[in-house]
Design a protein with these regions (language model features):
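Charged, alpha-helical interface segments at or near domain boundaries
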Residues: 1-20
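Generic, low-specificity signal for short hydrophobic/alpha-helical stretches with a mild N-terminal bias
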Residues: 8-12, 25, 67, 71, ...
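Short helix/strand-capping turn motifs
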Residues: 15-64, 74-75
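Charge-biased low-complexity segments
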Residues: 63-69, 100
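Short, compact, well-ordered microdomains
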Residues: 72-110
Length: 110
């Protein structure tokens, strides 16, 4: 098992969530400000569909209603954007996370 899957399974076990893999070749929807170092980082997983994992990830306090707010990004490229959130991508659809500076972490079902 690679270390990313192990970390993801550890997060799922910690919070009592089922593990649902987010393969590196599938896409997430992500806001551009995530790559700019903005905090906090929010993630919300919908059911997987087509070539997507179901994940929508954004940074900041507010979710924009701009139709171009989310851009598609392959999971494998998240390593270059914000590798510290990869460990949450094994959470099942219906789960969300919020992480902030200084290791703040809030994970739960929606």
């Amino acid at each position: 098992m690679d270390s990313e899957n192990k970390d993801q399974k550890d997060i799922c076990n910690k919070f009592g969530a089922s593990f649902v893999e987010s393969p590196s070749y599938l896409k997430i929807g992500i806001s551009r400000n995530v790559s700019e170092g903005a905090w906090p980082i929010n993630g919300l997983r919908h059911p997987m569909e087509g070539d997507t994992t179901g994940w929508y990830i954004w940074a900041g306090e507010e979710l924009s209603d701009d139709p171009d707010f989310f851009v598609p990004l392959h999971v494998e490229h998240l390593k270059a954007w914000r590798p510290e959130i990869i460990k949450y991508l094994g959470l099942a659809p219906g789960w969300r996370f919020l992480v902030g500076e200084d290791n703040y972490e809030d994970v739960g079902r929606i």
